[in-house]
């Protein structure tokens, strides 16, 4: 699909004029560059861009300047609309939050009795709150002009008829402005007016009920119920507004992506028409624009705050409804117990927010199972179990999905509606987001309703003023904090192999360092030049762990190793300087532990001595709450001081033992197994967790991988610097988002703690009504999600960068029963970096043909899922079969410097940069750096000791292709097609040479000694083959292996079981377009044109040239003959390969090289011959011919010569007649010379003699006259004619003299 159609299909019709004017820009480009002036006129373009100066004016301006002005016009339009939209969303969310605060105060007022002392004061306070709400709403109301220009369709049609118009009221109004205002402002005014009048009416009804006596209590309850119904309607209206703003945030993200793609497409089109390369410069300016740096983190934070308040308000409303509809215990004693139970159940939320600010401890993954604190913290967390079972996941279901980048915002907003937001973009949320009604709820729990209303009033006083304006100013340039992870492994990939070969077992969680754990270093923060003092976490982690694991929590600060702060027993917090000493063997684990314990003691005592202060006050408060929840702190009332001190001492000793064991394990791995940094990854994480700790969800975006093995970092660092510019060979941008869904299950036979089951039933509405499973099912049903079982960042990064080594290791392990597949199944579906719409268009043309072009795809999910699932499923079956490994792919466009973009739209920029990297590492035994990892014969027969140890303890783990991957978007999308290579093992030698040219280490095939020895062994083995059948064929394949590789290039359909472990798979057939055959013919004609031109020049030189020209023609004519034959051979070879769909090397490097070298040699030879001949110039005299051998014809007698004879008075006695000599008697022109012509004696006694003498005299005079003539500057042909004439006259003179002598002799 072309981008113009995609833009019109995906654009929001309300703001269609605010998008990039792609079609108008295409027309303007043709007018500016002059490529097609018939499309439109200058007046049309000017009118489209509203009188811009880009195309007008009498002063000459280059096309670049005019195009830049058009881009600036579009950028200004998009930037202004984006900022207005962000401010409008923030204003609407602020008004919604104010409304919910007022409704919360109104619910508090309903709990007061009319005869209570503070009822009148509370009622007056509520009126002031309503007035304050009205002032804030008037100040933050958003008019239609602020939200952008309305289209003609919006002005003419009804809002309800347009399904794409979001947030517009269905009530009819007189104008579009009133409709817009009703959608954005009147939704709140109705809530305010109803509540105000309802408050006064409720007070009057209550006062009437008090005067009327006890008989009218039913009417009072009925009035309270009616008031609650009206409040519920207000809550529904607020929920509708939040839903509309959620869709606005999703629309804004799509708006940014579409416009960025439009600018990228239009700049490329300008380069195409203008024959320039300015697209990169234009896009560098686009990246710095305001619309590319919108603070989506702030929008998500404000939206999450509103949804948390909405859920709290709903719980308070349900609590009040149950209290109003309940029967008094005095009237019906039988129901007193049930009423009491219901009140305790519905009041659990406010109780959980009450004492000692326990809100943060419930979100922290460190909690306790103390029975005395069950009522204070009804929410159950994963950390409530014991430490040994906390790190196991028998009762937690983990599912990981891959998300397309353009659907990340939609998924995050969907999750945010159901679960609280813990962290957005790596930034933890504060108390105002996680619990906006904390102070008010605490007062309600203490039955201090006046204090609750005063807390709500204080919140209103701080709203809509400086804080909101400050947040509005922060709508641009929102910062995010990346999470960095570095995994350590050795050259034998021991830890990676363990993770791929070992299964989960009940005993895997026993002990400090289970077999499946790997050494990992984790930290958070922006890249820094000086990071030696940064705090990092040295961990023994599971690579495939879920977000429920405490080690994956990014909200816990890496501040201290204190027991009340540490999130896991497998984590040690230390500085990077100390980590460098440990990895280099400069410090022992025991000594490092002593330093860490001293720092922990100093931090606990509040001694801030430079680097020794590792814990802040906030972390201590958080740790104190965690320790209180676990029962590790104070004894919970009644315990003596001595028992508390002993418990703290035991906890510290246990923590010290855990730290020592972790440090010792890392030390042994470094010293004995030689582990070093292998793979580094960084990403931006967004975390969600339910209030009771039943569900955890995380979304990782902008994931990038970096190679660290075989790299030499500086001496003062343990990895390469974070700010170092990395080439595309070392950085892999992962073009997908990662969704981790983890939640407790109840049907797997694992019994949860009793208090957790009771809290799940009493408190959490999702678990109680099975809505959590429904919500997860809705997530799974999204077309943009694809489940990938067993996915982990460590496995993907290692398999991507070190594919050849892993395949070589797998080949050595293939002979063992316990061998497994070391290459993950998802690798070939997720390693494509060409994430571009052009790729989708190519795939449409290649797979769907005519049907795909006619399909109407208005949805990104449909366009991604509806592409040729049959062929993709077949590819998935082939890839999912045992031993299905990727084929060699050594194709890179270059080593482009990669700059990490830190903006909010980093994924878009990274997708643009990802086009520099085409494919993952090869499987041909040569990695991207040219390092050979193909095992030798001895290695394949005798594996190393670590490999044997792995195989000895590795159970069999078959990995069939999962059904979900067979129909996943990665097989049916263009990215799966583009990852298929074009070359196979037949071009491995070329790949090795290409890899070596990038600076890699020399491979065995590059060493001529090893190459000669290998061919000699093959030659000797050829004659030792047993059997008579096929002996000749086997001998030829041994002696000439390239013939076998050439025949192996042909691809035939293979079944899913046709591949063996460790072998090389045959790729899919390449579909050839008809235009490819025409291109092959055009190439032949171009070669023939050049060859015919060379042949014409050489033939001309040989026929009409001088001796030097003839030599040059002889040199160039074989060149022309060779290229005529060579071009025809190349044409036949390519045509045959295209017909058979053979993936041969279509890039011809031999022919052009020979052509250039031959032409250079020919021209050099011609120039050399001319220079050498003129320097050694010599005269070539022409000797006179004898009379007997002369071939010149005799001159017949002529009567005109008789008068001349009378003038000659020459006696017969004269010796001879010679032509007059002169200095220029010798004529030299074109290599010819004429000498003096001797004249024999003759007499005049006979007429014939006289005629011969006259003829000889005329010839001699002609030769003498031609002698002194200068031929300098004359054409060569004219010079040649003159010389020929002179020689003819000389020959005639000689003939005449001989004839005269003969006549004289006859006369005598």
Curated annotation (Swiss-Prot):
Chief site of localization: membrane
GO terms classed as biological process: polyphosphate biosynthetic process
Membrane topology classification: Multi-pass membrane protein
Basic and acidic residues bias (residue ranges): 197-209, 332-344, 848-857
Disruption phenotype: The VTC2 locus is refractory to knockout, and may be essential. Partial disruption of the gene results in reduced polyP accumulation.
KW Cell cycle (keyword) present: no
Example of a GO cellular component annotation carried by this entry: vacuolar membrane
Span list, region Disordered: 144-220, 321-384, 611-645, 846-890, 915-946, 981-1004
Localization terms from the record: Vacuole membrane
Function: Accessory subunit of the vacuolar transporter chaperone (VTC) complex. The VTC complex acts as a vacuolar polyphosphate polymerase that catalyzes the synthesis of inorganic polyphosphate (polyP) via transfer of phosphate from ATP to a growing polyP chain, releasing ADP. VTC exposes its catalytic domain vtc4 to the cytosol, where the growing polyP chain winds through a tunnel-shaped pocket, integrating cytoplasmic polymer synthesis with polyP membrane translocation.
Protein name stated in the entry: Vacuolar transporter chaperone complex subunit 2
């Amino acid at each position: 699909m072309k981008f113009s159609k995609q833009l019109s299909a995906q654009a929001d019709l309300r703001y269609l004029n605010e998008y990039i004017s792609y079609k108008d820009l295409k027309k303007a480009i043709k007018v500016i560059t002059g490529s097609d002036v018939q499309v439109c006129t200058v007046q049309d373009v000017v009118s489209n861009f509203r009188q811009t100066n880009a195309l007008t004016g009498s002063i000459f301006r280059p096309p670049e300047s005019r195009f830049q002005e058009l881009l600036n016009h579009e950028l200004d339009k998009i930037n202004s609309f984006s900022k207005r939209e962000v401010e409008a969303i923030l204003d609407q969310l602020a008004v919604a939050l104010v409304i919910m605060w007022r409704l919360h105060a109104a619910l508090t007022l309903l709990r007061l009795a009319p005869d209570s002392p503070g009822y009148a004061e509370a009622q007056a306070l509520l009126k002031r709150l309503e007035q304050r709400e009205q002032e804030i709403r008037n100040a933050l109301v958003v008019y239609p002009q602020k939200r952008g220009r309305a289209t003609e369709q919006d002005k003419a049609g009804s809002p309800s008829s347009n399904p794409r118009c979001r947030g517009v009221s269905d009530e009819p109004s007189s104008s579009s402005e009133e409709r817009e205002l009703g959608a954005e402002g009147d939704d709140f005014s109705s809530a305010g007016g109803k509540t105000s009048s309802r408050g006064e009416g409720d007070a009057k009804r209550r006062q009437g009920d008090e005067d009327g006596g006890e008989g009218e209590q039913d009417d009072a309850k009925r009035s309270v119920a009616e008031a609650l119904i009206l409040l519920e309607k207000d809550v529904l209206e607020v929920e509708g507004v939040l839903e509309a703003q959620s869709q606005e945030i999703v629309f804004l993200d799509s708006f940014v992506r579409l416009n960025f793609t439009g600018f990228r497409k239009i700049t490329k089109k300008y380069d195409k028409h203008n024959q320039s390369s300015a697209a990169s410069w234009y896009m560098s300016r686009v990246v710095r624009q305001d619309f590319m740096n919108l603070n989506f983190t702030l929008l998500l934070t404000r939206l999450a705050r509103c949804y948390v308040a909405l859920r709290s308000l709903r719980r308070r409303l349900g609590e009040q409804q149950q209290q109003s509809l309940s029967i008094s215990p005095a009237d019906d004693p039988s129901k007193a117990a049930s009423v009491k139970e219901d009140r305790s159940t519905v009041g659990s939320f406010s109780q959980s927010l009450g004492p000692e600010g326990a809100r943060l401890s419930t979100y922290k993954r460190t909690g306790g199972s103390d029975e005395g604190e069950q009522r204070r913290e009804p929410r159950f967390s994963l950390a409530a179990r014991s430490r040994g079972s906390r790190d196991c996941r028998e009762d937690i279901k983990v599912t990981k999905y891959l998300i397309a980048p353009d659907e990340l915002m939609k998924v995050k907003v969907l999750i945010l509606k159901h679960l609280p937001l813990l962290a957005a973009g790596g930034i933890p949320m504060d108390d105002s987001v996680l619990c906006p009604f904390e102070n008010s709820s605490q007062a309600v729990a203490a039955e201090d309703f006046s204090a609750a209303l005063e807390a709500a009033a204080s919140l209103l006083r701080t709203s809509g003023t400086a804080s909101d304006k400050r947040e509005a100013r922060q709508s641009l340039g929102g910062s995010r904090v990346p999470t960095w992870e570095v995994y350590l492994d050795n050259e034998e990939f021991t830890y990676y192999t363990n993770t791929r070969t070992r299964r989960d077992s009940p005993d895997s969680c026993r002990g400090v360092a289970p077999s499946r754990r790997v050494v990992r270093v984790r930290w958070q923060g922006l890249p820094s030049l000086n990071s030696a003092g940064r705090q990092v976490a040295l961990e023994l982690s599971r690579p495939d762990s879920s977000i429920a694991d405490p080690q994956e929590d990014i909200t816990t600060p890496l501040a201290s190793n204190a027991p009340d702060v540490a999130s896991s027993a497998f984590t040690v917090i230390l500085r990077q300087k100390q980590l460098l000493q440990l990895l280099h063997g400069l410090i022992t684990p025991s000594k490092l532990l002593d330093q860490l314990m001293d720092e922990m003691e100093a931090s606990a005592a509040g001694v801030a001595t430079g680097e020794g202060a590792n814990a802040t006050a906030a972390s201590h408060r958080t740790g104190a709450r965690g320790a209180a929840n676990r029962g590790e702190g104070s004894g919970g009332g009644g315990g003596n001081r001595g028992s508390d001190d002993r418990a703290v001492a035991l906890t510290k000793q246990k923590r010290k033992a855990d730290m020592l064991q972790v440090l010792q394990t890392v030390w042994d791995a470094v010293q004995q197994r030689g582990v070093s940094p292998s793979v580094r990854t960084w990403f931006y994480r967004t975390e969600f967790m339910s209030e009771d700790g039943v569900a955890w969800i995380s979304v990782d975006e902008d994931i990038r991988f970096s190679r660290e093995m075989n790299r030499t970092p500086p001496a003062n660092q343990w990895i390469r610097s974070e700010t170092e510019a990395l080439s595309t060979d070392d950085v892999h941008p992962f073009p997908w988002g990662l969704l981790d869904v983890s939640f407790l299950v109840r049907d797997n036979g694992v019994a949860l703690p009793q208090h957790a089951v009771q809290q799940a039933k009493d408190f959490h509405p999702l678990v109680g009504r099975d809505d959590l499973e429904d919500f997860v099912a809705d997530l799974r049903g999204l077309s943009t999600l694809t489940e990938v079982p067993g996915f982990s960042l460590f496995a993907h990064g290692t398999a991507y960068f070190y594919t050849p080594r892993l395949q070589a290791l797998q080949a050595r392990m293939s002979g063992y029963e316990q061998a497994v597949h070391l290459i993950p199944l998802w690798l070939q579906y997720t390693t494509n970096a060409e994430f571009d719409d052009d790729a989708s268009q190519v795939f449409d043309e290649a797979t769907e043909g005519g049907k795909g072009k006619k399909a109407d795809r208005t949805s990104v999910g449909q366009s991604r899922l509806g592409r040729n699932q049959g062929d993709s499923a077949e590819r998935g079956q082939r890839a999912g079969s045992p031993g299905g490994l990727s084929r060699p792919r050594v194709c890179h466009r270059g080593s482009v410097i990669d700059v990490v973009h830190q903006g909010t739209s980093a994924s878009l920029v990274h997708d643009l940069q990802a086009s520099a990297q085409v494919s993952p590492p090869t499987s041909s035994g040569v990695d991207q750096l040219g390092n050979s990892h193909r095992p030798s014969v001895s290695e394949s027969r005798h594996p190393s000791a670590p490999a044997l140890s792995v195989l000895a303890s590795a159970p069999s783990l078959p990995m069939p292709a999962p059904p979900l991957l067979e129909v996943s978007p990665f097989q049916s999308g263009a990215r799966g097609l583009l990852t298929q290579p074009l070359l196979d093992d037949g071009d491995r030698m070329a790949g090795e040479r290409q890899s070596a040219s990038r600076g890699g280490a020399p491979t065995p095939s590059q060493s001529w000694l090893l190459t000669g020895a290998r061919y000699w062994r093959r030659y000797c083995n050829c004659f030792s083959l047993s059997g008579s059948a096929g002996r000749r064929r086997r001998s030829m394949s041994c002696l000439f292996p390239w013939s076998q590789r050439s025949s192996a290039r042909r691809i035939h359909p293979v079944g899913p079981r046709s591949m063996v472990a460790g072998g090389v798979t045959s790729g899919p057939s390449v579909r050839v377009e008809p235009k490819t055959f025409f291109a092959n013919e055009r190439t032949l004609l171009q070669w023939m044109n050049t060859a015919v031109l060379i042949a014409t020049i050489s033939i001309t030189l040989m026929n009409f040239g001088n001796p030097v020209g003839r030599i040059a023609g002889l040199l160039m004519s074989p060149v022309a003959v060779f290229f005529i034959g060579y071009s025809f051979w190349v044409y036949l070879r390519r045509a045959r390969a295209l017909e058979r769909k053979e993936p041969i090397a279509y890039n011809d490097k031999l022919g052009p090289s020979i052509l250039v070298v031959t032409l250079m040699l020919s021209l050099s030879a011609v120039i050399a011959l001319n220079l050498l001949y003129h320097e050694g110039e010599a005269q070539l005299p022409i000797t006179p011919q004898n009379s007997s051998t002369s071939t010149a014809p005799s001159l017949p007698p002529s009567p005109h010569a008789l008068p001349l004879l009378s003038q000659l008075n020459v006696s017969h006695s004269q010796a001879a007649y010679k032509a007059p000599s002169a200095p220029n008697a010798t004529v030299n022109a074109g290599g010819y010379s004429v000498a003096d012509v001797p004249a024999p004696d003759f007499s005049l006694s006979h007429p014939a003699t006289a005629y011969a003498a006259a003829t000889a005299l005329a010839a001699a005079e002609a030769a003498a006259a031609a002698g002194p003539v200068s031929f300098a500057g004359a054409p060569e042909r004219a010079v040649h004619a003159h010389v020929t004439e002179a020689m003819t006259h000389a020959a005639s003179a000689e003939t005449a003299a001989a004839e005269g002598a003969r006549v004289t002799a006859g006369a005598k």
